[in-house]
């Protein structure tokens, strides 16, 4: 009787591994549906890097449009008081800088 339950348990484990596409991970890298986990991680990292680049482009395009809409030109900023020449940066997400204010009181005591 114990042999029958043991055999059924082994068959159940083998069936579940087959259904989910997971190869045995003993002594070798795990695979999910035929792909190495390392390859999957590298693809995700590349996708995240590409998304960050796209977000950076969108942010700077938006900032440029806002500056042009407000008719703020370089000569106006140059002629302004020294405190108005400062451009302050903040981080929306780590690694993505964005201009938030021109000529603010940030940093003044």
Curated annotation (Swiss-Prot):
Family membership: Belongs to the arminin family.
Signal sequence region: 1-21
Native source organism of the sequence: Hydra vulgaris
Tissue/organ expression: Expressed in the ectodermal epithelium.
Residues the record lists as Isoleucine amide modifications: 106
Locations listed in the record: Secreted; Target cell membrane
UniProt entry tagged with the keyword Secreted: yes
Protein name per the record: Arminin 6560
Function: Antimicrobial peptide with a broad-spectrum antimicrobial activity. Keeps its antibacterial activity under a wide range of salt concentrations that mimic physiological conditions of human blood, which is surprising, since Hydra is an obligate freshwater animal with nearly no salt tolerance. Does not affect red blood cells.
